[in-house]
């Protein structure tokens, strides 16, 4: 509902959003949390098409830098449907649409007896390119939603990222939002577990 305006959604492509490599591209956190893989294609030296598969998390080498070779393009984006896995994403911006993110977060996980497992969490706006939040994933992995505390998340975020203000948001604001989005996602899971225990949905 918040991904671009109707004109952008009518003309833009997912491959273009990925290949652009913007630090605040909105599709990439979602695809990283879903462990997406790209198929890259180009015309080879002998006139035959050559393809290769690259995990999205290995696609970026720096700000607006990718592993794409001359003449190569993104042919396909593949990921598994969440199924029993939980998935949430949220974009923070000043306007509802036609605005660039201050940050966007996406998280996927599985419920293992009330514990969050196989956690994948990704952000844009915190690093030179959209990336998985590995240390935060480790801090969340195996815990129940009510076991996550603000101090731990704040400490991990402070240790994991360069504290740099941007044109659209200060570092302090982005760090606060990054933590609160994790809490929002896991609180949704806690509510779902409580509803499942009472037979309500």
Predicted features along the sequence, with ranges:
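C-terminal structural segment of proteins
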Residues: 1-201
């Amino acid at each position: 509902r918040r991904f671009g305006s109707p004109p952008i959604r009518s003309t833009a492509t997912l491959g273009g959003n990925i290949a652009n490599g913007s630090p605040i591209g909105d599709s990439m956190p979602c695809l990283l949390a879903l462990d997406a893989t790209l198929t890259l294609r180009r015309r080879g030296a002998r006139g035959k098409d050559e393809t290769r598969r690259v995990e999205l998390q290995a696609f970026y080498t720096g700000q607006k830098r990718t592993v794409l070779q001359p003449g190569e393009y993104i042919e396909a984006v593949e990921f598994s449907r969440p199924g029993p896995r939980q998935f949430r994403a949220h974009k923070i911006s000043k306007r509802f649409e036609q605005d660039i993110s201050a940050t966007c977060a996406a998280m996927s996980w599985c419920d293992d007896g009330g514990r969050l497992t196989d956690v994948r969490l990704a952000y844009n706006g915190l690093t030179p390119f959209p990336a998985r939040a590995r240390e935060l994933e480790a801090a969340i992995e195996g815990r129940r939603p009510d076991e996550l505390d603000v101090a731990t998340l704040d400490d991990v975020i402070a240790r994991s990222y360069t504290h740099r203000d941007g044109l659209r948001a200060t570092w302090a604001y982005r760090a606060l939002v990054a933590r609160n989005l994790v809490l929002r996602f896991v609180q949704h899971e806690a509510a779902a577990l409580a509803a499942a225990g009472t037979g309500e949905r």
